[in-house]
Amino acid sequence: MQKEIFIAGGCFWGVERYFQKVKGVLDTKACYINGGFEGVKYKEVCEGSSHVEAVRVIYDNSKITEEDLWKLYLRIINPYSLNKQGNDRGVQYRIGLYSYDKDLLKKFSDLNEAFMKSEGKKNYIEIQKVEDVTLAEEYHQNYLLKNVNGYCHINLDDIPEEYQKQ
C-alpha cells in the first residue's frame, strides 16, 4: 500500500537524495511545510517564515516499513540538535516527521517515545500533523542528482545493503 510521510532532517537536498536511494520509496519532492501559509518562497523561508524544509516521501509499505524508515531516519539526523543539522542553522532546519494520517503519526510517535526511553533523554524530533505544504522551487527538486558535487551534510552512502535500491 502506498503511504506518504514528510521527512525533515535539515537541508532537504540530502534528505531527498538519501531516501531516493532506499528500496520501497516511489517518489520524493522537496517542500516547505507547517509555516502557517502556502505559497512561500525560499527567500521567505530563509528570512524566518517558520516553515520547515521537508521531503514528501511516497513509499510502498509492503517493501519498507515505518520501523525501517525510522531506523534510516535516525542514521541521517542528530536528534539532540535544535534547529541545526550539519552546517545548516535556522528554524527551517528543524527535524521531524509529519503526516496527514493520524495512525502514521501515532506509529512514529510511539517509535520516538521508545527511542527516548532507550536513550534516557528527550530529543527535538517533531511528530506533527501536516498543516500546509508548498512544493519547493524546481531548482531544489532532485538537487543532488543535478549537482552531484553539491553541498550535503548527510553521508548518502550510509544505507544498509538490505535497504538499498538495486
Swiss-Prot record:
One GO term under biological process is: cellular response to oxidative stress
Q: Which reaction does it catalyse?
A: L-methionyl-[protein] + [thioredoxin]-disulfide + H2O = L-methionyl-(S)-S-oxide-[protein] + [thioredoxin]-dithiol; [thioredoxin]-disulfide + L-methionine + H2O = L-methionine (S)-S-oxide + [thioredoxin]-dithiol
UniProtKB keywords: Oxidoreductase
Provide a GO CC annotation, any one: cytoplasm
InterPro entries per UniProt? Met_Sox_Rdtase_MsrA_dom, Met_Sox_Rdtase_MsrA_sf, MsrA_MetSO_reductase
Role, per record: Has an important function as a repair enzyme for proteins that have been inactivated by oxidation. Catalyzes the reversible oxidation-reduction of methionine sulfoxide in proteins to methionine.
Q: Which Gene3D superfamilies match?
A: Peptide methionine sulphoxide reductase MsrA
Family, according to the entry, reads as follows: Belongs to the MsrA Met sulfoxide reductase family.
Q: Provide the top EC class.
A: oxidoreductase
The EC number on file is 1.8.4.11
Q: What is this protein called?
A: Peptide methionine sulfoxide reductase MsrA
Which residues does UniProt mark as catalytic?
Answer: C11
Classify the source by domain of life.
Bacteria
> Which Pfam family, giving just one, matches this sequence?
PMSR
Among the GO molecular function terms of this UniProt record, one is: L-methionine-(S)-S-oxide reductase activity
